[in-house]
Design a protein with these regions (language model features):
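Short basic, glycine-rich beta-strand/loop surfaces that mediate nucleic-acid
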Residues: 52-59, 88-109
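An accessory alpha-helical subdomain
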Residues: 108-167
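Short, ordered loop/turn segments at secondary-structure junctions
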Residues: 41-43, 82-86, 107-108
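Hydrophobic, well-ordered beta-alpha structural blocks that scaffold small-molecule cofactor pockets
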Residues: 1-42
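ADP-ribose/adenylate-binding Rossmann-like module
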Residues: 53-54, 64-91
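Short amphipathic alpha-helix with an adjacent loop that forms part of the alpha/beta core around
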Residues: 43-50
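Short glycine/serine/threonine-rich phosphate/pyrophosphate-binding segments
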Residues: 22-24, 63-64, 113
Length: 167
């Protein structure tokens, strides 16, 4: 697996499915700032062709397989919730603290383990990290504006975290 963090601003994302599974996926996407297009049933090829990424949740496996095959043929990356062989990518367990994004993934093998790791991270990185990240970001910007090298900036960031007892 290759972990990527995508900026959702220019991403064309679709969501197909039914019921609570689709609703949960819609909520996850919205929380990430993704404006996913809710697709009608049946999904026409022209709507699929306009997408870059398709999420499928709450469909029977046969329907999901057919939709995934059609989408892939049009160059769309596909994630079918809980059907590993139909996924081009996986969504990790996510912990957000403002702009701080911590994730855990098992490549789709053991989602319960990824969830447990996320819960452990949540205990280690509480809500205070939202403010800490802003403080570190401001300090980093200052050091960069002073002309420090990337290595020096990195060292200063580490020293500040240690001095503040954050890590």
């Amino acid at each position: 697996m290759l972990p990527l963090v995508l900026n959702p601003v220019n991403l064309k994302v679709g969501l197909a499915g039914r019921g609570p599974a689709r609703d949960r996926r819609a909520a996850l996407l919205a929380e990430a700032g993704v404006e996913a297009r809710l697709l009608p049933e049946p999904v026409p090829d022209d709507l699929l062709a306009a997408l870059q990424v398709l999420f499928v949740a709450g469909l029977p496996e046969g329907e999901a397989r057919d939709l995934a095959t059609r989408a892939r043929a049009l160059g769309v990356l596909v994630n079918v919730e809980d059907v590993l062989p139909l996924c081009d990518f996986h969504v990790p367990a996510i912990l957000r603290r403002g702009d701080l994004l911590l994730t855990a993934s098992t490549g789709g093998q053991v989602p319960g383990l990824a969830r447990a790791l996320r819960e452990s991270l949540a205990e280690q990185f509480g809500p205070e990290w939202t403010v800490r990240l802003k403080e570190l970001g401001a300090a980093r910007a200052k050091w960069r504006s002073e002309g420090l090298s990337p290595g020096e900036v990195s060292q200063h960031v580490r020293e500040l975290m240690v001095r503040m007892g954050w890590l």
